[in-house]
Each structure stands twice: as C-alpha cells, then as structure tokens.
Swiss-Prot record:
Keywords: Amino-acid biosynthesis, Cytoplasm, Isomerase, Methionine biosynthesis, Nucleus. The gene is MRI1. It catalyses: 5-(methylsulfanyl)-alpha-D-ribose 1-phosphate = 5-(methylsulfanyl)-D-ribulose 1-phosphate. This is Methylthioribose-1-phosphate isomerase. Catalyzes the interconversion of methylthioribose-1-phosphate (MTR-1-P) into methylthioribulose-1-phosphate (MTRu-1-P). InterPro entries: IF-2B-related, IF-M1Pi, IF_2B-like_C, Initiation_fac_2B_a/b/d, M1Pi_N, NagB/RpiA_transferase-like. GO terms for biological process: L-methionine salvage from methylthioadenosine. NCBIfam families: eIF-2B_rel (TIGR00524), PRK05720.1 (NF004326), salvage_mtnA (TIGR00512). The keyword Disulfide bond does not apply. GO terms for molecular function: S-methyl-5-thioribose-1-phosphate isomerase activity. Belongs to the eIF-2B alpha/beta/delta subunits family. MtnA subfamily. Its EC number is 5.3.1.23. It is found in: Cytoplasm; Nucleus. Its main location: cytoplasm. It comes from Scheffersomyces stipitis (strain ATCC 58785 / CBS 6054 / NBRC 10063 / NRRL Y-11545).
Length: 409
C-alpha cells in the first residue's frame, strides 16, 4: 500500500484499540486538533458541521464510525438488533445528501450484513467483523486509488501538452480542497497536482514543459481553498498563489497575455482540475459551488473567440469510481444540499495578534442582518463542459464522437 508519510493525515483509525480520530478542519490552518469520534452521532455531527469534509473522507469516517459504535455496543452487552443498527446507519447517511460516497459505503455495509443476518438478529462479533473488514478495505483501497488517480492524471497532462506542442512553464487552477484532508491520503484533484509537480517541476522535468505554479480558489463561503488547500500546498512546498473565486477569468487572461502575476512567471493556465462529490451516468458532475463557472471560463478560452495554443485549457474532473453514480441519469436528478444562511453572512476565525500569536475565535458579520440568502453547497457542471474524467482506472474517460461520456464501459 502507498505511503502517506509525506502528506497530512486527516483520518486516524487505530486497529488495535478500535478508535477513530479526525483532524478538525474547522480549526485549520491555525490550530491542529484531532477530534475523537466514538459514536455514530459523533460522526453525524462532525460530517454535518464539516469538521470533516470531502466525499471520500466522509465515506471513510462514516464507515469507521459504524465500526467504533458497534464495537462499543458489544463491549456494553450487545443487545442491539440489526434493524436498530440499520436505523442508525440510515440516520448517518442524511448528514450530507449530495456526496454519493457516503451513501454507497453505508449501503454496502447494510447489504453485506443483510446477506447473512436478519433484521431481528442481534448484532454480534460476526456482524462486527463484516463491518470492520469492509471499512478497513475501504480506507486502504481509497488510498491506493488516489495514487493511481494522480499517476493517470499526470499521464493525461503530459500527453495533452505533447499533443498541443506546448513548451515552457504552465499553471493549474483548482477549487475547494481535494487533497489528503478530503480523502484517506494524497487526494484526487490535488493528488494529480501533487503527482504532476513531483515529476514536472522545473528541476525534475524530463519534458520540454514544467508545472510552475498552482492557483487555488478561495472557495466561498466556507473557504476550503483558502484554509485547507493552501495549508496542504504550503506543507508540501508546492508553489502557489491564493486567488478569490471571481478572479479566475482575469488570471487566465493575464497569464495568457504573457504578463506576470506578482513575481510569478507568466505561465499560462493549461488545466483546471476539480474533484467531485457525484458524477452521474452522462458525466454531469456535482462539486463545490463555483465549479460550474470554472468550466464556463475554460470553455470560453477554448472557443474561437481567442486564438493560440496557450489559451487552450482542459477542464478535468478527478474522482474515484466510487463517486460515479450510474443509477442517476443526469445532473438534473442530483439533490443539492443547501447550507445555513449564516455561513454566507458571517466569517469565523481567530484573532491574529500583532505579535503573531493566535487569540480567541470569533464570528463576525459581513452582511445586512435579516436579508434573504441562497447558499447551495454544490453546483452541477454539465458534461458538455468537461474534457476528461480521471479515475483510478488506467483509461481516462473522454467524450466520444457524439460528445458523450461512456462511464458504464
């Protein structure tokens, strides 16, 4: 299994003591604190409050929460029925409805248990072992698959740049957080960026091009890009510059015009790489709000309105196969979670003292009180605006001659 020694660890599961801890992402980047998850209720709260987030990560936390909850129940007498266990699992599934990974993992657990036990059977050691083995495999498979996604994305980037005859420095734009903090390790979209920088940074690249810079979007209103992606990029010393979500068009145009951004090289944006919370059968993709507009920006610069190979941008979705939902035909059928209004009208963070120390955390209002607010957590990018879907499979999914993805093949 691939190592996570060089990357952050958002999920800690102790196989010997059967304990689960998660890195509280609401406290990052100023405070690193691990939160104990002892029950399914703890997991529901952590997922709902977004103390853990990212489709693969919440699925893993959800599964491990069922493990620790079941283990504790057995130690306390073990009088819970399979039916009661399933009720708790169904409740946990409602914590984040848009991300398909959580639902898939919890439904897999129910199917495996139902294959051998009835609803009225007591949850015993055999039931526990089914849940335990599945959850450990889910974690280990996700980690291995993330490294495959990174390698496959790197290969696609190299092939694309060679095909375009591109030479020199290039940049990548991403949104939200899709790295070690959103998965078991390495990441999906950020995993591709990690793998690409490892092989294509200027000092290492054997090609005629190199990855010079990454531009993570702030990702309002929860600021996962500002808080989490910058935390990971800084941790691994990958050169980056944070931008607001509404700066991308200007950024791309400026770099494509061979102009510098601050002291950064005028390296054109060649790829926008995003993760996914759900990819449906036709390739429509639900991801963090703001993703759709990034695809329209890429589409504009790829149009005939602008010329020159430096202006061509590939829009890539990176996700494990577990994120692909073949039971849903189009993005119109995806349930989009809506978050509380106060997440948009307030900001939370610690006081930064003049001496550099960290003070108390406060919530500060930034909008007129009592106003109407619409705060969807996700949007849906139409498959027509997506160039490639990269999974752990060696085949990178691109559209056929009819402009359609064939994800079921």
């Amino acid at each position: 299994m691939a190592s996570t020694a060089k990357t952050l660890q958002a999920i800690k599961f102790d196989k010997e003591n059967i304990s689960l801890q998660i890195l509280d992402q609401l406290l990052l980047p100023y405070t690193t604190h691990y939160l104990d998850i002892k029950t399914i209720e703890d997991a529901f709260s952590a997922i709902r409050l977004m103390q853990v987030r990212g489709a693969p990560a919440i699925a893993i936390v959800g599964a491990f929460a069922v493990v620790v909850d079941t283990n504790a129940s057995l130690k306390n007498g073990g009088n819970k029925t399979v039916s009661k266990l399933f009720d708790s699992i169904d409740y946990l599934e409602t914590s984040r409805p848009t991300a398909v990974n959580l639902a898939n993992a919890l439904n897999d657990i129910k199917k495996l248990v139902s294959a051998k036990f009835g609803q009225n059977d007591l949850v015993d050691e055999d039931v526990y072992q089914i849940i335990y083995k599945y959850s450990v495999a889910l974690y280990e498979d996700d980690l291995a698959n993330n490294f495959k996604i990174g390698a496959n994305g790197l290969n696609y980037i190299v092939e694309t740049l060679k095909k375009d005859g591109f030479k020199g420095a290039f940049s990548i734009v991403t949104i939200c957080n899709t790295g070690s903090l959103a998965t078991s390790g390495h990441g999906t979209a950020l995993g591709i960026i990690r793998s690409t920088y490892d092989k294509l940074k200027k000092s290492e690249s054997s090609e005629e091009f190199w990855l010079d810079h990454v531009y993570p979007c702030e990702t309002r209103p929860y600021n996962q890009g500002a808080k989490l992606t910058t935390y990971e990029l800084h941790y691994e010393q990958i050169p980056f510059t944070l931008i607001c979500d509404n700066m991308v068009s200007s950024l791309v145009n400026t770099l494509s015009s061979n102009k510098n951004i601050q002291d950064n090289a005028a390296a054109p944006v060649k790829f926008i790489i995003v993760g996914a919370d759900r990819v449906v059968k036709n390739g429509d993709t639900a991801n963090k709000i703001g993703t759709f507009q990034l695809s329209t920006i890429a589409n504009f610069f790829n149009s005939n309105k602008l010329s020159g190979s430096a202006n061509k941008i590939k829009f890539i979705v990176a996700a494990p196969r577990t994120t692909i939902d073949l039971n849903t035909a189009t993005g119109d059928e995806i349930v989009i979670e809506e978050r509380p209004a106060n997440e948009l009208t307030t900001l939370k963070g610690p006081v930064l003292r003049e001496d550099g120390s960290i003070g108390d955390k406060y919530t500060v209002g930034i909008a007129t009180p009592g106003i109407s607010v619409w705060n969807p957590a996700f949007d849906v990018t139409p498959h027509a605006l997506i160039d490639a879907i990269v999974t752990e499979e060696e085949k990178v999914y691109t559209k056929n001659s009819h402009g359609e993805f064939e994800l079921s093949k």
